[in-house]
């Protein structure tokens, strides 16, 4: 998943990717970042995401939970810090309480983490008005 998340982050112009926990540390040996986006984009493990949110960014939880706003109706803030839940669970309540908003992708069931990242970042780009970074073909 991390390799696919890094590829999506690179494709859609994210500035960095942060993660918590130890799953990635155990999976790092499998080298799933086939486009080596980690060389262009910081991938940083942190203890608590609340401590690393860049100044001016709005924390947005992405989780399939009661009360979340559907993505098709959502207007992304100019500077967002998206926090995604794990595939085999949900975000802790302290995280969703901390976030300004919680959004979800309307589906029948839950999505793979990397697929959800792609959908959210594509939606952000598609609803935006600056495609200049996305016109180059590589």
Predicted regions, residues:
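Conserved RecA-like P-loop NTPase ATPase core
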Residues: 1, 9, 83, 116
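RNA substrate-binding interface of SAM-dependent RNA methyltransferases
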Residues: 2-63, 125-130, 134-137
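Structured adenosyl-cofactor binding patch, chiefly the S-adenosyl-L-methionine
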Residues: 10-11, 98-135
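Short, acidic/turn-prone active-site loops that include or flank metal/cofactor-
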Residues: 22-24, 86-89, 106-111
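Short secondary-structure transition/capping segments
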Residues: 28-32, 72-74, 115-116
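A short acidic, often aromatic-flanked loop/helix-cap motif at beta-alpha or helix-coil junctions
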Residues: 48-53, 67-69, 110-112
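Alpha-helix C-terminal capping segments
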Residues: 49-56, 74, 96, 105
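Active-site/ligand-binding-proximal alpha/beta "capping" segment
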Residues: 65-103
